[in-house]
């Protein structure tokens, strides 16, 4: 190490405690992820625009690229996704071919569901079968349909649960956020505390108790693997 690097290293503070204990004593935990993909995209764009300049063409701006390009979806539907960020593993390629995505929402949903929890519960297969009309299902309630329509009745994002809590059970935005935090912590006891107010609130809005219990069971299972949409 250089002397400057050594000085920085000496000033670093470490702890032997895990993340949960650190949060309990009031310290903030951040996760920082480095993505080489962003550098690859930057370099690729630079080379493309250098070539376009030679051909006297306008430079490409990533912000201007359409999200509904039919030729791009044709490549995706064939599983030609080698070197495409988050879509390049053998397993997800198989699901892309089955899904045959034709809109950006499909891609986001597949990436969100392609994780151990949803895979173990066959959520990807359920989404694919419902998208192509091969599996019959019922939303059971207009408010549920309004929120889960784009994902064919499958709970995919924490924001959907917050909306369900508000629309179906009458939660305030603050109460819905408490439910979101309980999901984020993935602590079963905290989720259990949310069950009674969710069902009681639904009954007060004239919803069927058994249906409300079934919906909360789905939310509880989702809490074991769910993330927010931006993640």
Regions found by a protein language model. Name each.
Residues 1-5:
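Extracellular interaction modules
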Residues 231:
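Active-site pocket-lining segments that scaffold enzyme catalytic pockets across diverse folds
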Residues 6-226:
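Mg2+-dependent phosphoryl-transfer active-site scaffold
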């Amino acid at each position: 190490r250089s002397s400057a690097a050594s000085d920085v290293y000496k000033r670093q503070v470490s702890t032997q405690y895990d993340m949960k204990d650190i949060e309990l004593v009031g310290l903030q935990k951040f996760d920082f992820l480095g993505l080489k993909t962003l550098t690859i995209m930057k370099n690729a764009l630079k080379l493309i625009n250098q070539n376009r300049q030679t051909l006297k063409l306008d430079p490409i701006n990533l912000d201007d690229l359409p999200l509904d390009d039919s030729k791009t979806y044709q490549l995706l539907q064939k599983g030609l996704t080698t070197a495409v960020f988050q879509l390049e593993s053998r397993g997800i390629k198989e699901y892309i071919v089955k899904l045959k995505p034709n809109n950006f929402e499909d891609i986001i949903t597949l990436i969100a569901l392609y994780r151990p929890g949803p895979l173990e519960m066959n959520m990807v297969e359920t989404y694919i079968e419902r998208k192509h009309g091969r599996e019959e299902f019922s939303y059971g309630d207009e408010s549920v349909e309004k929120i889960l329509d784009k994902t064919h009745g499958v709970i995919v994002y924490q924001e959907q649960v917050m909306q369900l809590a508000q629309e179906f059970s009458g939660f305030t935005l603050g109460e819905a956020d408490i439910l979101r935090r309980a999901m984020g912590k993935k602590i079963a006891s905290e989720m259990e505390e949310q069950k009674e107010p969710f069902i009681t609130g639904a009954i007060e809005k004239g919803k069927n108790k058994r249906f409300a219990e079934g919906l909360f069971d789905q939310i509880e299972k989702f809490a074991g693997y769910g993330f927010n949409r931006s993640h």
